[in-house]
Amino acid sequence: MNIKINEYYIPTSLSGPYGITAGIDEALWFTENKANKIGRITVKGEIEEYLVPSQDAGLSIIVSGTNGDLWFSEYNANKIGKITIKGEIVEYSIPTADSGPFGITEGPDGAIWFTELTGNKIGRISNLGEVIEYKLPNDSSYPSSIVCGSDGVLWFTENQGNKIGKITMLGEITEYTIPTIGSGPVGITSGPDGALWFVEINGNRIGRITTEGIINEYDLKTVKARPHAIITGSDGALWFTQWGSNQIGRITTSGEVSEYEIPTANSEPHGIAVGPDKAIWFAEECNKIGQLILL
């Protein structure tokens, strides 16, 4: 497969871009972990930035809601933030102190669901900012990323618990153990085949779990690739960032893996998303936003 990668510098130096998502405004929105800003980039590479009110908020993952608002996690500030496409920001405090909010997604109920890394809970926040929390069965599970599955249930990774969990709209939790010990699952996404696909940052594998809980794992070609985030591409394959090897990876639903080198050395790719142009967009902690175009 032929591809082309473009990279766009962020105006604020040392901004530390981390999470990225596509908005309803034909642009991509991303978090700037070090600059404490939310960024917006058009498919032509034009960038705007918005400062978050809470200082050193620890901006992490960002997701677009169906009503157009962008929601993001503030790991250090212990808040969930919301920004409109006009740049207006509101922040909501989480009841559990030092909960470490990280992964975030929209649920089938229209609410925003998120993980609490250190709080060991899954949270739900309404559009009005009302928060409900559900404690996980096992301590120190370190719930990381979360996504809505094809079955209408929220699925999440347990980075330290070495499990994939799911939670219903009623707060009922089920967990499935990953075969590889200490795999360190992080990113998770709903695949084109109806299954959930996730990355193993320590196991150096891509995992697949059916909605019935059956797990398969696929080895990556590059050792110590440290896969971080994953998304379903417009081509029907899964795309993921390889933070350790400075690559963007691709895996088909049959398990065939390809890897593509990022032009900038040591770019530290993290978040990944599909843009309105159907390209793969990703956040590089080296202060750039990348765009991978399928030729």
From Swiss-Prot:
Keyword Phosphoprotein: no
Name recorded for this polypeptide: Virginiamycin B lyase
Cofactor(s) recorded in Swiss-Prot or TrEMBL: Mg(2+)
Pfam families given in the database record: Vgb_lyase
Gene assigned in the entry: vgb
Role of this protein: Inactivates the type B streptogramin antibiotics by linearizing the lactone ring at the ester linkage, generating a free phenylglycine carboxylate and converting the threonyl moiety into 2-amino-butenoic acid.
Family label: Belongs to the Vgb family.
Gene Ontology molecular function, alphabetical: carbon-oxygen lyase activity; magnesium ion binding
Signal peptide limits: none
EC number(s) given by UniProt: 4.2.99.-
Organism of derivation: Clostridium beijerinckii (strain ATCC 51743 / NCIMB 8052) (Clostridium acetobutylicum)
Record-annotated disulphide pairs: none
Transmembrane regions listed in the UniProt entry: none
Record's subunit section: Monomer.
Domain of life of the native organism: Bacteria
Record-linked PANTHER family: VIRGINIAMYCIN B LYASE
Keywords from the named record: Antibiotic resistance, Lyase, Magnesium, Metal-binding
